[in-house]
A protein has these predicted regions:
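Catalytic-core regions of core metabolic enzymes
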Residues: 1-461
Length: 461
């Protein structure tokens, strides 16, 4: 790590050196610094003084010093150089553009691959690689490539809270050498990756990117965030990573033609990841929704329809069976099924069984509203957590594909219940969402994607 420095509050050293130590990087770590020691590791004044081979170098030094660093990497036989360093083509200035060109020429001439510049680099849990101390150490099945470093923080943290883990995450910044096209091709053949996600602001080779997207989408699901869609966004993309953003309608058509799935932002990407990972593909759009609260049930009907799901009415035979164990006072035996029985464990199992046996719905969705529950702490612990754990286990016995909606809570004792419910879902591998609209939208798009993926081959090749 070239440019590492001491001190307990040096942010860059914490990001790029301490993260490797914390995640258990399996190789040797060498800080390059004017100090004798950094983070408990012996430091070296320059790359050439390090004994033995060096495979990968992370640059934290100013842009003006990177050409000499690249030359040292060539002499040392370094395989890859990742530059957190900014101040290159993304500035839009001739000096920065030329500096990036020279850097690429030196690296390519000496067989060194460049990641960046202006990027966070690589998070690979299986190898102990990270640039953030709180990223999960467990490896998963999702890969993410991103021109934006901050988007990798957003996605990894938000997805981790929903039970998603990653195989590889690459923030590639300006993409001066290794870029989105090469990364897509690599990940499409990566046995450790089942789903590919990408944040793209623009590209220097649209036709090649379209072909790479198409190749990847034939191998596994590909989910894309494309930003820089407005005139202001286009200018922002250029100044951020030097990307050529292009016309949004062209991008929309290209992503669809490639067979990839475009989403609006990180929140929707996480919802889609949860759906792909934890929800078996339903056979259709019909859902039976279990919930509590009359207003919440009415809202649920609107949100399901807006998201592309269908709520079939409960037929008389099913209603008659529900009446055998559901107290009519405080209940609504339509769909959504708003039942007071949700508060009584002895009625919950036959309720779930009845809806699971009902042949019309293709899936079950349980809507939980911690924000409207009793607020005394002892009730929170006894009912909202302990009883809900038993209810969750019963719900998971249903044969139909199932999802859970856990409404967000902003304050009060319900916060404890919220996190406990999320933890239950993570432990049981259940797809869960913060709102019914987001659940319906994700499941609806999942069904669309599943149908289109089966219907026709993607092009071009």
């Amino acid at each position: 790590v070239v440019g590492a420095s001491g001190g307990p509050f040096n942010v860059h050293t914490m990001m790029f050196l301490d993260s490797l130590v914390k995640l258990g990087y399996r190789g040797r770590l060498y800080p390059v610094s004017s100090r004798e020691e950094v983070s408990g590791l012996k430091a070296y004044r320059n790359l050439k003084e390090i004994p033995g081979t060096v495979d990968h170098v992370i640059s934290l030094i100013p842009a003006a010093a990177t050409l000499d660093l690249a030359r040292d990497c060539v002499v040392k036989g370094v395989k890859s150089l990742q530059l957190f360093t900014a101040g290159f083509a993304e500035t839009g200035e001739a000096e920065g553009v030329e500096l990036q060109r020279e850097l690429v020429n030196i690296a390519r001439g000496g067989g060194v691959r460049l990641i960046g510049p202006n990027c966070m680099g690589i998070y690979c849990p299986a190898s102990g690689m990270s640039y953030c101390p709180d990223f999960p150490p467990e490896a998963g099945e999702v890969a993410f490539i991103s021109q934006s470093g901050s988007y990798t923080y957003l996605l990894v943290r938000m997805a981790a809270a929903r039970g998603i883990r990653f195989s590889k995450v690459v923030s590639y910044g300006n993409g001066a050498d290794v870029n989105e096209i090469e990364l897509l091709d690599y990940l499409s053949g990566d046995a450790e990756t089942e789903i590919i996600c990408a944040y793209i602001e623009g590209t220097r080779d649209g036709p090649q990117l379209l072909r790479a997207l198409s190749r990847a989408a034939r191998a596994k699901p590909v989910i894309v965030i494309k930003k820089g869609c407005t005139p202001a966004g286009t200018r922002g993309a250029s100044s951020h990573t030097g990307a050529l953003a292009g016309d949004d309608s062209v991008w929309e058509g290209a992503i669809k033609q490639a067979g990839a799935l475009r989403v609006d932002d990180v929140e929707e990407m996480v919802d889609m990841l949860v759906t792909f990972r934890f929800l078996p593909l339903p056979s259709g759009r019909r859902a039976a929704v279990l919930g509590v609260g009359g207003g919440a049930s009415v809202r649920a009907s609107d949100h399901c329809e807006a998201g592309g799901l269908i709520l079939p009415p409960v037929p008389a035979a099913v209603r008659a069976r529900l009446k055998q164990f559901v107290p009519l006072a405080g209940s609504m035996l339509g769909n959504p099924v708003d039942v007071l029985a949700e508060r009584y464990a002895d009625a919950w199992a036959p309720l779930v069984q009845t809806l699971d046996d009902w042949d019309e719905p293709d899936m079950l969705i349980w809507q939980i509203s911690p924000e409207i529950e009793p607020l005394r702490e002892e009730i929170v612990r006894q009912y909202m957590i302990d009883m809900r754990r038993r209810m969750m286990q019963v719900f998971c016995t249903a044969r139909k594909p199932k999802a859970v909606v856990v409404h967000a809570v902003e304050s009060g004792p319900g916060l404890e219940s919220l996190e406990a419910l999320r933890q239950m879902c993570r432990e049981l591998g259940v797809a869960f969402y913060p709102s019914l609209y987001r659940a319906a939208r994700a499941i609806g798009r999942y069904l669309d994607f599943g149908r289109s993926a089966r219907a026709a081959p993607h092009s071009p090749s």
